[in-house]
Structure formats: C-alpha cells, structure tokens
C-alpha cells in the first residue's frame, strides 16, 4: 500500500471495511470511486471511466459523480441490489493538517433505504434477519426503517417453508450469520432474489433494550439482536423512532402460501406483477399512505379469530350506514400526511421545514377525527382511539415556528416565523432597515448627481456598489466616490457610508441564516419527544382509513356483510369475482351460488374451456379472504366459516420453484395441501394431473379427490377435464358434481358462465379452438378424430379399494408395452379396475400373458410399498433411478 499516495492509502483503508459495497469517497464537490468500484460503477451507472495517478507505476481507474446529484446515482445502484458506503470529509480542509479526515457516515442498502424511487409510499420496505438454531427452527425478525416497525416470529418446517415466509415479507435484503451454508445462501439469492448481508452479533444493543420488553424467548431475542446490530452498524445515527417489537405467530392468521397468493392475485397480477388488476387494487380506497400499507398487511395475513373479524365488519357496517360520517372522515384523511415516515425522518435528522409543515397540517385534522369516532356507539371504536393523543401542543409549537411557505433547504434561511426568537427578530430588523436605507441612499445619490440611471447593486464577490455608466462619469463630484470595479460600459464605486451599512447588513444576514438553522435543529429535537405519540396516532388513523376504504368499496360495488358461522358450511348467493366484475366495467357479469352444507365437502367441477371454472374457484377464495380481513363480500347473501388455510393450484406453473416442470409443480403443491390441510381449510385444485399421461393424470386426480374426501374433509373445489371422474359422485357421499353450462347454437358454442348441478355432457374443446381461429382444415380433422374416439369404448374408472389409512393413492398398476399377468389369481380383479385406452375389439382379443420373473416381481413389490407423498421430488427420482438400474442388471 505504501506505493500509493496518502489519499489513496486512506481510500484503501476505508474500503477494506466495506468490501461488499461501492465506496462513495468525498473529494471536494465530487464522490469518487477507484479501482474495481470505478470499473463496475461506470458500467452500471453509464458514466465515464477515467484514471488518475495514485503514486504507483500504473494509473488507477476512477469515476465520480457530483455530490449534489449523488442521491440519484445511489438510488440506481441500490435498486439493482448493491450497497453504497458514503464516506464524507469530517474536518474542514482549510484547517486540516495533511490528508483531510474522512469517515463512512452511512451504509445504504436495499433494506435500509429511507426514500427514493424504490420506496413505494403504500408499501413497507422491510429488512429481514434470519437466525437458524440447532433444533432446526428459525427466528425471523423484520424492520422497516422508514416507519420504525419491528416484528419477529418463530418458524419451523422445511427450508422451503421458511423461505416462503421470508418471501412473504417482501424484504429486498436479508441479514444472516456467517455460518449459513452455501446451499441456503444460494436459495436466498437465486430463488428469492435478495441481497445478502452478514451480522454475527445477537445481543440487544445498549439503549434499545426497552424495545424487547415484551419478548421473552431467547431465540426471538437473538434474531432481533442480529437485526438491530446490523441497522446500527449501517446507519450510524439516531434510531429514536424504532417501535417496540411485535411478536406474531403464523398460526394466528389464515395461512396462504406464496403460490396461492400469486394464483389468487391478491396484491399483484400474475402476468405483469403490478398492483393494477389485483384484489388490493380493487379494495384500496385509502386516503393515506400509511393506511395503504396497513391494508396490504391485512391482506397478507387474514384473521382466523371470529370475534376480531366481526369487530371489523361491524365498524365497516357503521361507515356504510353513515354516509356523511364516512365522507367527512375521507375529507380529513386527505389532509393527513405519512405520520410514520415523517416520524422516521425526524429521528434520522433529515426532516426539513416543509415536512414539519405537513406534520402540522396533519395534526390539525386529528382532534375532529377522534371526536367523531368517540361519538360512535361501538366498543371496537372506543378501544381503537383509547390513548390517542392529538398532540395539540406540538401543533401549536409548529404553528408559531415554521413559515407557511418555507424553502426546501434548511440552510437557506426564511424558515422561522417572526416573533419566535428575539435575537432573530433583531437581526431581521437590521437587515430589513438596512435595505430600506440603501434604497433611500440610491434616491439621494441620484438627486445629488442628477444621474437618473445611477443604481446601487450587490454581488457576492464585491458586495454593495454604486454603478454609473461611463457616459455619466463626468457628473460625479470629485473625492466623494472610491472606485471599486471597472466594466466595459460602466464604473462601480463605494462610499464610506455604504461600506459601514454593508458590514451591518451582511453580518445580520449571515447571522440570520445560521441562527435559523440552529433554531430549526433545536425544534427538530423538540419534535423527537413526540415520536411515540405520532406513531400511535398513525396506527389509529391507518386502521380507520382501511375500514372506511372497505366501507367505500362495499357501497360502490354493492357488497354484502358476511355472516360468520362456527359450522362447516358455505352459503353464497349470487357470488361474484370482485376484480373480474370491476374490469368488465358495467358489462353483464353472471353471478353464481356456492352452497356447500356441512355434509358436502367436494365440488367436482366439469365444463368447457373458457367457461369460467377457474374464475368460479378464485371467486370463492377471494370471498373468504375479503370476509376474514373484515370487508364486505361480492354477493347478495353470504354465510361463511372461518378458514384456517387456503391451498390453490390454479393457472400456469409458478416460477418461484425454478427448473421444475408444470407437473412437478402440480404435485408439490398437491403434496403441500395434502400434508397440511385440515377440515377447516379451503382447497382449490384446477385440472390436477393434466401435466402427465391421461392414465397417470386421471389416476392421480381420483386418488387425490378420494384422499381429501376421506382423510381431510376440507371444503374443496376440484375442476377436471376427466369427465370419467364424475362417476365418483356415486361412491363418495360428500362429493357433488357441478358444471359450467354452455349451449350450442348454429354450430357455435355459447358459454353461459352459470354453475349448475350435475356433470357436463361435453367439453367443447374444438369449439374453443375455433374461437382461437385455428385453420379450418385442422378443425375439420380434429372433428374426424373426435368422432372415431367417441365411437370407442369409454375409459373405465376403477372401483374404490380399501386402503390403509396412511396411504394416499390406490395401489399403482404397472403397464408395460405388452400386457403382463403377475399372478393368475389377481388378473381378473386387476382387469376389472384397469383404465382402458383400447377399443372394444382390441381389448377383447385373447393374448398370452407372460409372467414376471423373480427380479421384476421383487421390484414391483418395492414400488407398491413406496409412499410418494412422503418423499421429496429428488428422493423419488433417486429411488426410480435405483429400481431402473436394478432391472437393467443381467
């Protein structure tokens, strides 16, 4: 390092502590980057890469950005998942001996960004910290630095389950300890696309102990400690706005895994990944940014406590029934700014005068809001506003201190009102009167000299001056003026009298700016005291905002208050898919009933493609989610149970599990439901088994239906193209066939989008192909093939067989290229239960059936004993490979 200049040595010393970040190194009016940072930053930011002499034989790569524009460049890097360490000059270059002392004042990362393009006002920006314990459990702690919110939970289950919970937080960055395995880190970076950071310290930092008073579990405290230590290390500033840690447990809320949230498009659409077109888009009528964030949190975690849901529903009903109360509340909420993030800016010391003016305007609305809610005859409302302080003393303080139209910068003056500080008033008097005196002097000098164009001006270099054009220089009295500057067409002068006043005025103006800055920073410290009260107010106002949002959308869209029942029954009259109905924008939407009494668990849904099966299934899920977040639902009448979980397999393969086929994803999601669902769950399976051969697909579909029916008892909607499965209604007493109706008119299919009892008579697949405008010749050929197939013997559905309780699917039937007889005594029974794809003529032929040898019989016996649903995909593949290898050995 000694071969470099002292400044480059200083850079390298600082950089050594921030190897995983870009180092923005302050040099005068620029932030400079050197070596690899410069090469990479020049590429990412599309700025010029240059070089400089650093003392070694080779020139050092260098690039830089102006300090006043650095914010935008930092945002660009953080948006791409990078970290940026900001290194400032911490001493005056004029007084420095040797190299100016520099220190990193902040490490900006994806999870610690406070403002910018990446921060959506209606979304949290969580930083996650994950701690792994020897017993296989994990603790997950999250912090939103912009609002001060902190949460922690204990997690058990597979690594995939843990990762899905991490993903559900929406965190862009996760903090782990250095013991995490490479495989675990790869899943975090590649699967979840998160920035990885490291922190080994887990003790709660000094001064933050009060935030974990309600946390007693050592595991949870370790996770929070890791999170807090990382935040302190990166931010290097006051964290007065951090809120007490909230403990939550996943079993306190309805569980909806990430796949299901995506399939249902709760907060973003599948295709565009945008809010528009999602359920959140429809329900979001909030007027405040913090209300929008709370709405999304509620949607991520619907309630499962019947009493809490009913409390919300009653408040929504109050707002629905009182139009004037609701409209008055909405008007006041429009004037309320983001109290949570304003409090965060106060704590961080980057709040400006305009922010405090917004805070005052927000607080002016609070007393009327609290008073209106206090008049309601509602225990939930009374409890909600209990302890809410309108902070009237803060409102008064800000009212007498901050100007009505302050500048953006707090270093330019003109931010403090007259009358707030005596010394400031004195300086302003001198400055104001001095300027008045100068205006009078200008008039007097014109009168004395008779030069009407004479003027008194000011610039930062020469101060005040008297300017006279060269044509009028002869009119100036001798000895009165002292030459100060010569211009092309004029001369500038000064007088003793003007010098004296200049000194007074400039001193006053300089002192005004400095005093205003000092007064503002002192005011900011006074506001800090109110941070806890502001955060409590923010929660109250956010909740009221979400409830009025529910009421507004419920009235606009003609939703109805659901009735919650402890029975396992669903009664939805004229239910609608809320988002599809909204997108149709006034066009006729066909409502559908969903009536499943306690003794009816499974709807087997058949019907044409494009007829609305998937929409009907999603509709039920969205109605239940809306009900359990406390919103009215799209129906004319709704009686619903409280579901503990929702499992879905609807739509295209999810890309969260990379490298898996559609069928594998289907099976993984089916396994998830089968392993975790209870009789209080809701299962929605759309076309399970379509990703494999017809034999396999139909067999698996039937086995899954039977298992759900017999072993789980969850309310289930199961759509299928296997019309042969509709005979299951005869053997499964809690299964009912329903179909989406369609009619044929003049050779064309008309979808009625109406759910009716019974099985569909045909699928109309060729008609759908016609709608897609496939070639006429292709359509004609498809009709010929269909006629031939329909003339053949139909597939026979196997009769139900008695299986052990732990088995999920019936015994597999081995199919080789040639029919095989295993044991003569079993052939008849197996033929009776086999699915036949052969025509009547072919299947009736008598064939000699070779018998399996001992090795093949042994392999078949092993296959029969395998419980696929207890195996991971990799284990199943390895087992298949082992058996195949065994058969191939001579």
From Swiss-Prot:
Belongs to the DNA mismatch repair MutS family. Disulfide bonds: none annotated. It comes from the Bacteria. This protein is involved in the repair of mismatches in DNA. It is possible that it carries out the mismatch recognition step. This protein has a weak ATPase activity. One of its GO terms (biological process) is mismatch repair. Pfam families: MutS_I, MutS_II, MutS_III, MutS_IV, MutS_V. Keywords: ATP-binding, DNA damage, DNA repair, DNA-binding, Nucleotide-binding. It comes from Bacillus thuringiensis (strain Al Hakam). PANTHER family: DNA MISMATCH REPAIR PROTEIN MSH1, MITOCHONDRIAL, DNA MISMATCH REPAIR PROTEIN MUTS FAMILY MEMBER. One of its GO terms (molecular function) is damaged DNA binding. ATP binds at residues 607-614. This is DNA mismatch repair protein MutS. One of its GO terms (cellular component) is cytosol.
């Amino acid at each position: 390092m000694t071969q470099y200049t002292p400044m480059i040595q200083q850079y390298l010393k600082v950089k050594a502590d921030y190897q995983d970040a870009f180092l923005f190194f302050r040099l005068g009016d620029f932030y400079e980057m050197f070596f690899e940072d410069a090469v990479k930053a020049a590429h990412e930011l599309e700025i010029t890469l240059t070089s400089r002499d650093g003392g070694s034989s080779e020139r050092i790569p260098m690039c830089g950005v102006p300090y006043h524009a650095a914010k935008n460049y930092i945002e660009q890097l953080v948006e791409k998942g990078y970290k940026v360490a900001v290194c400032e000059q911490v001493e005056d270059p004029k007084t420095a001996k040797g190299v100016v002392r520099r220190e990193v004042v902040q490490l900006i990362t994806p999870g610690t960004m406070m403002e910018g393009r990446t921060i959506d006002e209606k979304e949290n920006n969580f930083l996650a910290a994950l701690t792994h314990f020897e017993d296989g459990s994990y603790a997950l702690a999250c912090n939103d630095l912009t609002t001060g919110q902190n949460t922690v939970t204990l997690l058990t289950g597979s690594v995939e389950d843990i990762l899905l919970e991490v993903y559900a937080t929406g965190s862009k960055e996760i903090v782990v300890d250095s013991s995490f395995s490479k495989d675990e880190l790869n899943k975090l970076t590649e699967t979840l696309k998160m920035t990885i950071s490291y922190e080994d310290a887990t003790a709660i930092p000094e001064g933050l102990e009060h935030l974990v008073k309600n946390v007693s579990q050592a595991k949870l405290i370790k996770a929070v400690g890791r999170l807090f230590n990382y935040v302190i290390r990166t931010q290097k500033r006051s964290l007065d706005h951090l809120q007490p840690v909230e403990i939550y447990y996943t079993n306190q809320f309805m569980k909806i895994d990430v796949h299901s949230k995506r399939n249902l498009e709760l907060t973003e659409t599948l295709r565009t990944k945008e809010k528009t077109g999602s359920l959140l888009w429809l329900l979001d009528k909030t007027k405040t940014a913090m209300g929008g964030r709370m709405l999304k949190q509620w949607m991520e975690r619907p309630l499962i406590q019947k009493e809490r849901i009913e409390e919300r529903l009653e408040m929504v009903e109050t707002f629905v029934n009182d139009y004037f109360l609701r409209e008055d509340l909405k008007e006041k909420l429009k004037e309320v700014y983001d109290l949570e993030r304003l409090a965060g800016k106060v704590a961080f010391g980057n709040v400006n005068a305009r922010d405090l003016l917004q805070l005052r305007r927000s607080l002016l609305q609070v007393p009327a809001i609290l008073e209106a809610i206090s008049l309601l005859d509602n225990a939930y409302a009374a409890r909600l506003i209990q302890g809410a302080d309108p902070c009237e003393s803060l409102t008064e303080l800000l009212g007498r201190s901050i100007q009505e139209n302050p500048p953006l910068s707090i270093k330019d003056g003109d931010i403090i009102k007259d009358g707030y500080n005596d010394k400031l008033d004195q300086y302003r008097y001198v400055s104001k009167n001095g300027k008045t005196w100068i205006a009078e002097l200008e008039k007097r000098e014109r009168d004395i000299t008779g030069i009407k164009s004479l003027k008194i001006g000011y610039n930062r270099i020469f101060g005040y001056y008297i300017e006279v054009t060269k044509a009028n220089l002869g009119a100036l009295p001798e000895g009165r003026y002292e030459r100060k500057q010569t211009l092309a067409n004029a001369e500038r002068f000064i007088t003793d009298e003007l010098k004296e006043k200049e000194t007074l005025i400039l001193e006053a103006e300089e002192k005004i700016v400095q005093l205003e800055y000092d007064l503002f920073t002192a005011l900011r410290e006074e506001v800090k005291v109110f941070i806890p009260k502001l955060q409590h107010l923010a929660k109250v106002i956010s909740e009221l905002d979400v409830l009025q949002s529910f009421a507004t959308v419920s009235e606009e869209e003609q939703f109805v208050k659901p009735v919650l029942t402890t029975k396992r029954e669903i009664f939805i009259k004229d239910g609608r898919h809320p988002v599809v109905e909204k997108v149709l924008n006034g066009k006729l939407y066909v409502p559908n009933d969903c009536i499943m009494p306690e003794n009816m668990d499974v709807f087997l849904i058949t019907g044409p493609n494009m007829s609305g099966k998937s929409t009907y299934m999603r509709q039920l899920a969205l109605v239940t989610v809306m009900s359990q977040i406390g919103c009215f639902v799209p129906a004319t009448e709704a009686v619903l149970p409280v579901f503990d979980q929702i499992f879905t397999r609807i739509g295209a393969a999810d890309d969260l599990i990379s490298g898996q086929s559609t069928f594998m994803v289907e099976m993984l999601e089916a396994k998830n439901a089968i392993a975790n669902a209870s009789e209080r769950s809701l299962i929605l399976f759309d076309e399970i088994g379509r990703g494999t051969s017809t034999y396999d697909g139909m067999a698996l579909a039937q086995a899954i239906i039977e298992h759900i029916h017999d072993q789980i008892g969850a309310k289930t909607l199961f759509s299928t193209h296997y019309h042969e499965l509709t005979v299951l209604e005869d053997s499964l007493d809690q299964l009912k066939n329903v179909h989406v109706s369609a009619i044929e008119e003049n050779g064309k299919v008309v979808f009625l989008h109406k759910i009716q009892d019974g099985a569909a008579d045909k699928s109309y697949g060729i008609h759908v192909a016609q709608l897609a405008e496939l070639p006429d010749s292709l359509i004609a050929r498809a009709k010929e093939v269909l006629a031939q197939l329909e003339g053949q013997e139909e597939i026979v559905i196997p009769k139900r067989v008695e299986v052990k309780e732990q088995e999920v699917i019936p015994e597999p039937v081995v199919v080789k290229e040639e029919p095989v007889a295993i044991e003569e005594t079993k052939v008849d029974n197996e033929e009776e239960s086999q699915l036949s794809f052969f025509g009547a003529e072919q299947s009736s032929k008598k064939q000699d059936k070779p018998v399996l040898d001992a090795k093949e019989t042994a392999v078949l016996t092993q296959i029969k004993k395998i419980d696929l649903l207890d195996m991971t995909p990799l284990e199943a593949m390895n087992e298949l490979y082992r058996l195949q290898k065994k058969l191939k050995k001579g």
